[in-house]
A protein has these predicted regions:
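C-terminal extensions
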Residues: 1-18, 22-96
Length: 96
C-alpha cells in the first residue's frame, strides 16, 4: 500500500502495510510471516538473506529497503516510502 494511505489502526493484513503489494506479501509469507505483528523485532537484512536462500535466487537489494520500511513502521515509526531507506541500507552494507 502507498505509505501516504496507511492508517496504522487499520493494518490487519500484510497488504495493509506501507510498500507491500501482492508480490511482497508473498515474499513475507515465504518467510513465515502472515501477520503484520510478526514483523516486530525482525531484522530486514536477515529477512532478505532468508528470502534469497528460500527462493534460491538473489533478489534486488531494494527488497531490503521494503523490509526496512515495514519493520520500522511496525516498531512505531511513521510510514515512509521504501526509497527513504535506500541510503541507510547502502551505508549499513558498506559497514559489513
Amino acid at each position: 500500500m502507498n505509505p501516504s494511505k496507511v492508517i496504522r489502526e487499520n493494518v490487519v493484513k500484510l497488504t495493509d502495510l506501507p510498500n507491500i503489494g501482492k508480490a511482497s506479501a508473498e515474499d513475507l509469507l515465504l518467510l513465515g510471516i502472515d501477520n503484520p505483528s510478526q514483523l516486530i523485532g525482525q531484522c530486514p537484512f536477515e529477512m532478505y538473506e532468508r528470502l534469497c536462500e528460500l527462493t534460491n535466487a538473489r533478489h534486488d537489494p531494494c527488497v531490503i529497503d521494503v523490509f526496512m520500511s515495514v519493520t520500522s513502521f511496525m516498531s512505531g515509526e511513521e510510514a515512509k516510502p521504501w526509497w527513504a531507506f535506500t541510503d541507510i541500507r547502502k551505508q549499513r552494507l558498506t559497514e559489513k
